[in-house]
Amino acid sequence: MPFLRIKIYSTDLEELNRVVEKIKEIVKQTGVKMRGPIPLPTKILRVPVLRITGHRGTKIWDTYQMRIHRRIIDIATDDRTIKLLMRTPLITKPEKIQIQLKYIKDKNL
C-alpha cells in the first residue's frame, strides 16, 4: 500500500511539536493508519568566533550554535487525508518550520 512520508524540520521545538500534534489530529479524524512521529537525531550546527585577543595574546572564543529538530511521520495515503493536510494551515511561523512530503509506493505501513 502506498503511503505519504512527511519530514518536518525546525529550529523551534515547541512549534515543531505543535505542527506534529495538528497532523496527528487530522489523521485521527480521517481514521487512516499512521506511523510516528519518529524523532530523528537533533543536528547541531556550531560556529566558533574569535571574540577578542585577551591579555598577553591569549585568544577568547565565543561559540554560537543552532539546533535543528527533525521528525518523520508516515501516513497511509487517502485522498481525504491529503486534502485536509493541504488545506489546513499547519504553520503559523513559516520561517521556523520546513515540511517535505514524499509519496512512496509499494511498501507496507
UniProtKB/Swiss-Prot annotation:
Organism expressing this protein natively: Nanoarchaeum equitans (strain Kin4-M)
Gene Ontology MF, one: tRNA binding
Entry GO CC: small ribosomal subunit
Ribosomal protein as UniProt keyword: yes
Keywords annotated in UniProt: Ribonucleoprotein, Ribosomal protein
Protein name from the UniProt record: Small ribosomal subunit protein uS10
Coiled coil: none
GO biological-process terms attached to the record: translation
Family the UniProt entry places it in: Belongs to the universal ribosomal protein uS10 family.
Domain of life: Archaea
